[in-house]
Amino acid sequence: MRYPEHLLKLIHILKKFPGVGHKSAERFAFHLLNWPMEHLIELSETVKNTKDKIKQCLNCGCLTDEAACYFCDINQRDSQIICVTAFPRDVFSIEETHEYRGLYHVLGGVLSPLENRGPEHLSISRLKHRIQDLQIKEVVIALDSTLEGDATALFLKQELAADDIQISRLAFGLPMGSSLDYVDGGTLARALAGRSRF
């Protein structure tokens, strides 16, 4: 089947979204073609403004449109505990559980030799400084239950072992190979409540 060039380009771009295959991209493209022009302009401007305005928090690495994010307000959070995640989206997944009230630290990924991502590519030194400066008592490691997530968790445990802090990890009720982004709130809430020493 031969689509017009501009439609083909739109389908190709939509396929870049995670979990969107060719058929879904086709459906989205045809749906967008039926949108009124003002909705398309609004979508385009919203995407551009979001990309322009949203940045990483200077403290924790989460997403914000201010210098420091909501999650770093020590007057609103338990400042003795810090939850370490790989990506900002993980912070929002955990927040949806309403089970955690501490601070966060986003590493910016996990260790991955296949992608040439070593410890120097992650925000580990910043984490260590924050633990000292804030006199953190507990670090909760909330990384995906994958080989890379497990390797990163073990690395963090070794790096932080000298500090006099409790290190815990989300309970292993999470399915192996799962991504926090796809775990339902109930499962994530139980995993947070049942976290264990690590």
UniProtKB/Swiss-Prot annotation:
InterPro entries, A to Z: DNA_Rcmb_RecR, Rcmb_RecR, Rcmb_RecR_Znf, TOPRIM_dom, TOPRIM_RecR
Lineage: superkingdom: Bacteria
Record GO biological process: DNA recombination; DNA repair
Keyword Lyase: no
Keyword DNA repair listed: yes
Alphabetized SMART domains for the sequence: TOPRIM
Entries under SUPFAM superfamilies matching the protein: Recombination protein RecR (SSF111304)
Keywords: DNA damage, DNA recombination, DNA repair, Metal-binding, Zinc, Zinc-finger
Zinc finger (C4-type): 57-72
Function: May play a role in DNA repair. It seems to be involved in an RecBC-independent recombinational process of DNA repair. It may act with RecF and RecO.
Record-given protein name: Recombination protein RecR
